[in-house]
A protein has these predicted regions:
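Short helix-capping/linker turns of helical repeat alpha-solenoids
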Residues: 48-51, 55, 87-92, 104, ...
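Hydrophobic face of amphipathic alpha-helices that form TPR/SEL1-like repeat modules
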Residues: 61-65, 96-103, 129-139, 166-175, ...
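Canonical positions in the second alpha-helix
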Residues: 44, 84-85, 117-120, 156-157, ...
């Protein structure tokens, strides 16, 4: 009941007072379940001024090229560029700077995290609420650990379109005794925004319910998002495994060419997992049945751009 109450109340307006420790009354379980309704919203990020966007793109290029080397001096330059871009209205730079700091690549003080998160919130960027939820959950960025308030911020972020928050809240609501229908809606919403793990998780539930066509549609979203296991499962699913093979049976007829293409894509995604690959052209290469497969030269849009390595 406590968990559901927190996730419900997080959907209400939050005043941005990150130190709020007010006690909220708990509603009866039946009322909470009735009010957990979720409407899918995709996160929007305001356009950036041209100069700030140029800095962001260059910083992102440096970051991509430093993923394997992890040169600290390069991290310092990336941080500097992200800071300038962020302070000049580039919210993607704000997000990348905070994410990088939480992973130990950049140095961002607690009060800076809160100020930058508030900038996102003020701009209508749902990730701002998600970040505050992380800080409250972990007791970091100068905030006291507060599980209830963390959950409220996660739910607010999910309602406003944060795919990461939608995935996180869905995991909490997923069990049968809580709110699995809401969890499914959140996972689908996150998958539509390119959250590969949400797509993979949702496909498992659809497969178990023998909703195979829905499952492959969601797995296709997973492939587009760069989630390698989605490509692997589709590859094996089109080899027509026995229905008893619960891991890979997807109710599809054998199609060796489809299986081979998905396997090639899986290898690219697995080999370049460190670089966060995606397959935005998946529906051009592998439209789902009953569509016929078009000719394919074996190239992937993301891989070609990655190998070209143009800033």
């Amino acid at each position: 009941v406590l968990l559901l109450s927190c996730l419900l109340l997080a959907a209400c307006d939050l005043d941005g007072d990150f130190n709020n420790t007010k006690d909220y009354p708990l509603n009866p379980l039946t009322e909470i379940k009735a009010n957990l309704a979720f409407s899918c919203v995709h996160e929007t990020i305001p356009a950036s001024p041209t100069d700030a966007n140029t800095l962001f793109q260059y910083a992102r290029w440096l970051q991509k090229n430093n993923q394997l080397k992890q040169d600290k001096s390069v991290d310092t330059e990336i941080e500097r560029l992200y800071r300038i871009a962020s302070e000049n209205g580039n919210y993607k730079a704000n997000i990348n700077l905070q994410n990088g700091a939480m992973r130990g690549h950049f140095n961002v003080r607690g009060e800076e995290h809160l100020r930058m998160s508030q900038q996102l919130i003020d701009a209508g960027v749902a990730t701002g609420y998600y970040f505050v939820g992380v800080f409250l959950k972990n007791g970091s960025a100068g905030l006291k650990q507060d599980t209830e308030m963390a959950l409220r911020h996660y739910r607010k972020a999910a309602d406003q379109g944060s795919a990461e928050a939608q995935y996180y809240v869905a995991d909490k609501l997923g069990p049968k005794k809580i709110a699995p229908a809401v969890a499914r809606q959140m996972r689908k919403c996150a998958a539509e925004q390119g959250h590969g793990r949400a797509a993979a998780m949702l496909s498992i539930y659809l497969r178990d319910e023998e909703k195979y066509n829905e499952a492959i549609e969601v797995l296709q979203m997973g492939v587009a998002a760069g989630e390698s296991t989605s490509a692997s499962r589709l590859s094996k699913g089109f080899l027509n495994p026995a229905p008893s093979n619960q891991s890979y049976y997807l109710g599809q007829q054998e199609d060796l060419e489809r299986a081979a293409r998905y396997e090639k894509i899986w290898r690219v995604l697995a080999n370049y997992s460190y670089a966060n690959p995606t397959v935005p052209d998946i529906n051009e290469i592998l439209p789902l049945p009953p569509a016929q497969l078009p000719p394919w030269d074996g190239k992937l849009q993301w891989l070609e751009a990655h190998l070209a390595n143009v800033p």
